Amino acid sequence: MRRILSVLLENESGALSRVIGLFSQRGYNIESLTVAPTDDPTLSRMTIQTVGDEKVLEQIEKQLHKLVDVLRVSELGQGAHVEREIMLVKIQASGYGREEVKRNTEIFRGQIIDVTPTLYTVQLAGTSDKLDAFLASLRDVAKIVEVARSGVVGLSRGDKIMR
């Protein structure tokens, strides 16, 4: 089962390692992890995407609440939410492949942010599925040389606020 946890925690040294320690102690892999300060520089928001057994994930979520640095934990998948990921991808193409890269970048609403005679660097934001679909659309027409992805970030929709 895929889970996305949003964790509001104090922006302090060691807070990240304590949260991540809960996952590593149980042998759970983190699919993606993003952490950054919020509009309040004393707080950070951590978004963790993981896949696993529901019982163990519930246990981890309960133990996250007990950590001193953690102020709030919310599972984004439990309600209406918005999630996004940013990807930078370096693509090698020539001839027809270059036209296909430009066309697919436009279709997926990405931006070409760097161009050389043999490479394009494309920036794309969206759901993980959208980014995966973009990569799949290029596999037959160009060579994907390098990929960097930010990991998922998300917020609840509507009036629900994490403070």
From Swiss-Prot:
Gene Ontology BP terms: isoleucine biosynthetic process; L-valine biosynthetic process
GO cellular component, one term: cytosol
Top-level EC class: transferase
Keywords: Amino-acid biosynthesis, Branched-chain amino acid biosynthesis, Transferase
Pathway: Amino-acid biosynthesis; L-isoleucine biosynthesis; L-isoleucine from 2-oxobutanoate: step 1/4; Amino-acid biosynthesis; L-valine biosynthesis; L-valine from pyruvate: step 1/4
EC number: 2.2.1.6
Regulation of this protein's activity per its record: Sensitive to valine inhibition.
One of the record's GO molecular function terms: acetolactate synthase activity
InterPro entries for this protein: Acetalactate_synth_ssu (IPR004789), Acetolactate_synth/TF_NikR_C (IPR027271), Acetolactate_synth_ssu_C (IPR019455), ACT-like_dom_sf (IPR045865), ACT_dom (IPR002912), AHAS_ACT (IPR039557), AHAS_small-like_ACT (IPR054480)
Domain annotation ACT: ranges: 4-78
Catalytic reactions on record: 2 pyruvate + H(+) = (2S)-2-acetolactate + CO2
Oligomer status and interactors: Dimer of large and small chains.
PANTHER family tied to this protein: ACETOLACTATE SYNTHASE SMALL SUBUNIT, ACETOLACTATE SYNTHASE SMALL SUBUNIT 1, CHLOROPLASTIC
Other comment: S.typhimurium contains genes for 3 AHAS isozymes: ilvBN, ilvGM and ilvIH.
Family per record: Belongs to the acetolactate synthase small subunit family.
Protein name: Acetolactate synthase isozyme 3 small subunit
Originating organism: Salmonella typhimurium (strain LT2 / SGSC1412 / ATCC 700720)
Lineage: Bacteria, Pseudomonadati, Pseudomonadota, Gammaproteobacteria, Enterobacterales
Gene name in the database record: ilvH
